[in-house]
């Protein structure tokens, strides 16, 4: 789910009160759903709706009062179903994303596996600490970068582009070994596929990588020296990957031109 801040006229608390969750989602849960994040397009809750001991992620797209009701309902249905289908395809083809537990496109909600752990963004920042030297030689950080590149390559290989790749949209799920408390260890899970689409276009794949590259440089400027590991690992994941990396050079060039032109 995109977590862009809602407009000034759409106060999150006001919106949640005006467009509450469908009643069915508040019962028979053992505890009320907990609002985790509020975005311009929807809300993310943690809920125990299915079973008291199994937490789930509930993505809810409330009605948009500024849209025509029929158009709004059609768009909501399309986006909910599209995300559910893409997640199911990724799971079927071996890409680690949250499992889909339930969906009601008419009511505008999608219930997913709750991924424990934290975002990759947080793990990288904790690893970096206050360091300014030796980052390019950090073997464990470079290993994480390669796992990111492999995960993205596997997703692209099955014909899915994410649309909003950032280190906030990747999670590190803790390993089963309780003795391993390294924040860089864990299974990499790609999340928030609300803007994803099916595509085998080299251009679309290159733009996906470019979005991540720009976001990474902005979020982790001191770690830019290891980002090449992402692309190196990506290039080894599927036959067309080298072509995508070549296309990425063209996308970068266009991005630089736009920056110069303002």
UniProtKB/Swiss-Prot annotation:
Active site: 164
Protein's UniProt keywords contain Metal-binding: no
Protein location: Cytoplasm; Nucleus; Chromosome, Telomere
Record-level GO BP terms: tRNA processing; tRNA threonylcarbamoyladenosine metabolic process
Catalytic activity as recorded in UniProt: L-seryl-[protein] + ATP = O-phospho-L-seryl-[protein] + ADP + H(+); L-threonyl-[protein] + ATP = O-phospho-L-threonyl-[protein] + ADP + H(+)
Binding-site residues, ATP: 36-44, 59
Record bears the keyword Phosphoprotein: yes
Catalytic activity, EC: 3.6.-.-, 2.7.11.1
GO cellular component terms attached to this protein's record: chromosome, telomeric region; cytosol; EKC/KEOPS complex; nucleus
Domain Protein kinase, chain residue ranges per copy: 30-262
Chief place of localization: cytoplasm
GO MF, one annotated term: ATP binding
Superkingdom of origin organism: Eukaryota
Keywords of the record: Activator, ATP-binding, Chromosome, Cytoplasm, Hydrolase, Kinase, Nucleotide-binding, Nucleus, Phosphoprotein, Serine/threonine-protein kinase, Telomere, Transcription, Transcription regulation, Transferase, tRNA processing
Classification via SMART domains: S_TKc
InterPro entries on file: Bud32, Kinase-like_dom_sf, Prot_kinase_dom, Tyr_kinase_AS
Database matches in NCBIfam families: arch_bud32
Similarity annotation: Belongs to the protein kinase superfamily. BUD32 family.
Written domain comment of the UniProt record: This protein is considered an atypical serine/threonine kinase, because it lacks the conventional structural elements necessary for the substrate recognition as well as a lysine residue that in all other serine/threonine kinases participates in the catalytic event. BUD32 has protein kinase activity in vitro, but in the context of the EKC/KEOPS complex, the catalytic subunit KAE1 switches the activity of BUD32 from kinase into ATPase.
Job description of the protein: Component of the EKC/KEOPS complex that is required for the formation of a threonylcarbamoyl group on adenosine at position 37 (t(6)A37) in tRNAs that read codons beginning with adenine. The complex is probably involved in the transfer of the threonylcarbamoyl moiety of threonylcarbamoyl-AMP (TC-AMP) to the N6 group of A37. BUD32 has ATPase activity in the context of the EKC/KEOPS complex and likely plays a supporting role to the catalytic subunit KAE1. The EKC/KEOPS complex also promotes both telomere uncapping and telomere elongation.
Subunit comment: Component of the EKC/KEOPS complex composed of at least BUD32, CGI121, GON7, KAE1 and PCC1; the whole complex dimerizes.
Name of the protein: EKC/KEOPS complex subunit BUD32
Gene: BUD32
């Amino acid at each position: 789910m995109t977590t862009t801040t809602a407009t000034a006229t759409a106060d999150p608390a006001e919106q949640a009160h005006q467009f509450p969750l469908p009643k069915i989602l508040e019962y028979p849960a053992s505890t009320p759903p907990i609002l985790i994040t509020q975005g311009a397009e929807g809300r993310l809750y943690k809920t125990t709706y299915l079973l008291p001991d199994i937490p789930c992620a509930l993505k809810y797209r409330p009605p948009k009062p500024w849209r025509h009701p029929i158009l709004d309902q059609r768009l909501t249905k399309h986006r909910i179903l599209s995300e559910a289908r893409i997640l199911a395809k990724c799971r079927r083809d071996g890409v680690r994303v949250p499992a889909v537990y339930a969906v009601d496109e008419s009511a505008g909600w999608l219930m997913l596996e709750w991924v424990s752990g934290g975002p990759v963004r947080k793990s990288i920042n904790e690893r970096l600490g206050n360091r300014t030297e030796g980052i390019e030689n950090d073997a464990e950080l470079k290993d994480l970068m390669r796992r990111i590149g492999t995960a993205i390559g596997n997703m692209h290989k099955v014909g899915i582009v994410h649309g909003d790749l950032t280190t906030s949209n990747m999670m590190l799920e803790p390993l089963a070994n309780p003795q391993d408390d390294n924040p860089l260890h864990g299974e990499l899970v790609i999340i928030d596929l609300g803007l994803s689409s099916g595509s085998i276009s080299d251009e679309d794949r290159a733009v996906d990588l470019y979005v991540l590259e720009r976001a990474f440089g902005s979020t982790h400027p001191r770690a830019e020296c290891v980002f090449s590991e992402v692309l190196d690992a990506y290039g080894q994941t599927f036959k067309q990957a080298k072509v995508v990396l070549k296309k990425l050079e063209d996308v970068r060039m266009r991005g630089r031109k736009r920056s110069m032109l303002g």
